[in-house]
């Protein structure tokens, strides 16, 4: 049975991932990660950069190109997505850094607030390989996706796909994440 969680490996090269990590580590606009409407490090302990694809940076282009190929494959496997109305890549996305012991262990879905109801599919790119946990757990499907550099994961945003980060006590974790959403 299709759980609608798709994993695509080697979508970004290690060099591309390292380039994005360097951007995260040197960006002056990094701030504590928001969860819902505020910061609560007991539920989500991260450092985030809020980016826009319209900035046309090398980071934007690398991520956009990687996602384009994955979405084509995702839609082939899930053709019903073409019949639900017009939707596309949301302009905003997040680059996130989790320190050892940090993470997002709070189970959540990506359309849990009325302000997020337009979201259709979430995307996440692992930018580094984490060998001490560090993946993403989907408890309803008894599935954990491992954090492997260059790996893209796509899944539905709704309550049917609650997930949470698996905290690494010893290693950093870097991801890029965002959404495909209905467009008016």
Predicted regions and their residues:
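Fe(II)/2-oxoglutarate oxygenase catalytic core
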Residues: 1-152, 160-184
């Amino acid at each position: 049975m299709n759980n609608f969680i798709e994993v695509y490996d080697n979508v970004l090269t290690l060099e591309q991932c390292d380039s994005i990590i360097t951007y995260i580590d040197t960006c002056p606009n990094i701030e504590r990660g928001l969860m819902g409407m505020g910061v609560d490090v007991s539920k989500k302990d991260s450092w985030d950069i809020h980016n826009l694809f319209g900035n046309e940076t090398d980071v934007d282009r690398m991520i956009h190109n990687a996602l384009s190929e994955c979405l084509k494959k995702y839609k082939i496997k899930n053709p019903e997505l073409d019949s639900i109305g017009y939707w596309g890549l949301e302009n905003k996305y997040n680059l996130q850094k989790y320190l050892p012991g940090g993470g997002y262990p709070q189970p959540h879905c990506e359309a849990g607030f009325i302000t997020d109801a337009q979201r259709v599919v979430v995307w996440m790119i692992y930018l580094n390989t984490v060998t001490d946990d560090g993946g993403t757990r989907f408890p309803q499907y008894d599935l954990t996706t491992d954090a492997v550099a260059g790996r893209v994961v796509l899944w539905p945003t709704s309550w049917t796909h609650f997930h949470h980060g698996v905290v690494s006590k010893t290693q950093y974790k870097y991801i890029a994440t965002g959404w495909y959403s209905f467009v008016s």
